[in-house]
């Protein structure tokens, strides 16, 4: 009886304290809060004007959060479209059972046109050559392929110039097997306090629309609003908006007003798998860049740059434990890194720390250590890091 009680107590301890390890068999994981995602979606939808449709941007594996789980929640909450960057992302969603329209915002090689048509994927188009390849495949397969014409209003990436949009739209609309369902552009500075350039882009997009309409072409879904524009540029909502970074509870920049409540949905966690004492004069990791100046308690985390916890965090990063900080010590290795636990004596082997994403160690702070943006950190995490979903 005593043995059974001890076993149950031990299992309960694992399940409660180390939920990620219990579910993934690895002592590092990214915990994704689906209830927070649902709350974010609800608040985002409250900002959308003119009964516009909304598109959930789930490219890059939903910014590292897991495309299937995020897309499923988005569709449950009424997403009209899903958006990705490359065809493999779109096909993965189709193979996972999604029937919601999927838009590829980036370029797809013409050689992959057969898959675009077969998987019913909407492609961004900005050249006649792309459209001809898709048209030929649609005719061959006896299907209709939807496309959205990309317009370059100032990003200078892909897209037709606004003054040429009418001619291209007219040509696309007459091709067999093609439905020119949408046209879109992308803001470069909607997340800045000074939105003068964003409004220049908005006017350029309106010019493109007028050129298209002058050719007698009707396009049902016009969209340019990204996350920042959803929050601060209601006049840019048109027929659909694209929610990206704000889905994940992160702000597009520190210049965007917090007009709604957003909750970050990812917390990167790791278990301390080993603790040892380091004596004065002893060093840690490659290059021996950290040398103990005192008796030091050093913990090892099974997380390294091969997981997406970049070596550039060396000498900058800290981990969080119940609001207390412990610094990374020495160079981050491919599969492990070390933490100086000396000033947090309660931290022991088996305890779980947060590398970023907690209320007291945010994604934004961790990104600032690298001189980058919050978007990049979750995108860096690769498939070796299990995603554990709650809520």
Label the predicted regions.
Residues 24-38, 46, 53, 89, ...:
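Active-site anion/phosphate-binding pocket segments in diverse small-molecule metabolic enzymes
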Residues 43-48, 77:
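A short, Lys/Arg-enriched amphipathic alpha-helix followed by its capping loop at the start of a domain
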């Amino acid at each position: 009886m005593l043995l059974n009680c001890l076993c149950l107590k031990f299992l309960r301890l694992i399940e409660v304290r180390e939920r990620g390890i219990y579910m993934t068999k690895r002592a590092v994981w990214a915990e994704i809060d689906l209830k927070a995602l649902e709350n974010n979606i609800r608040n985002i939808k409250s900002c959308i004007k003119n009964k516009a449709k909304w598109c959930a941007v789930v490219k890059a594996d939903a910014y590292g959060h897991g495309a299937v789980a995020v897309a499923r929640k988005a569709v449950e909450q009424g997403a009209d479209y899903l958006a990705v960057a490359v065809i493999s992302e779109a096909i993965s969603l189709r193979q996972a059972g999604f029937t919601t329209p999927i838009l590829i915002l980036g370029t797809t090689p013409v050689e992959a046109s057969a898959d675009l048509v077969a998987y019913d994927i909407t492609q961004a188009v900005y050249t006649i050559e792309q459209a001809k390849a898709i048209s030929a495949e649609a005719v061959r397969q006896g299907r209709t392929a939807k496309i959205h014409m990309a317009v370059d209003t100032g990003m200078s990436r892909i897209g037709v110039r606004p003054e040429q949009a009418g001619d291209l739209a007219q040509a696309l609309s007459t091709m067999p097997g093609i439905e020119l369902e949408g046209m879109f552009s992308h803001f470069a500075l909607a997340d800045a306090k000074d939105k003068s350039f964003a409004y220049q882009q908005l006017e350029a997009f309106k010019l493109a629309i007028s050129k298209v309409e002058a050719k007698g072409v009707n396009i049902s879904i016009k969209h340019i609003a990204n996350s920042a524009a959803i929050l601060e540029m209601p006049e840019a909502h048109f027929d659909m908006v694209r929610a990206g970074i704000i889905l994940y509870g992160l702000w597009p920049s520190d210049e965007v007003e917090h007009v709604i409540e957003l909750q970050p949905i990812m917390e990167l966690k790791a278990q301390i798998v080993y603790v040892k004492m380091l004596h004065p004069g002893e060093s840690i990791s490659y290059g021996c860049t950290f040398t103990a100046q005192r008796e030091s308690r050093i913990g090892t985390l099974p997380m390294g740059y091969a997981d997406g916890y970049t070596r550039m965090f060396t000498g900058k990063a800290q981990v969080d434990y119940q609001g207390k900080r412990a610094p990374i010590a020495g160079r981050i290795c491919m599969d492990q890194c070390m933490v100086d636990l000396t000033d947090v004596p309660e931290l022991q082997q088996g305890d779980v720390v947060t590398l970023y994403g907690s209320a007291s160690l945010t994604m934004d702070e961790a990104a600032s250590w690298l001189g980058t943006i919050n978007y990049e950190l979750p995108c860096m995490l690769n498939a070796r890091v299990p995603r554990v979903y709650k809520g």
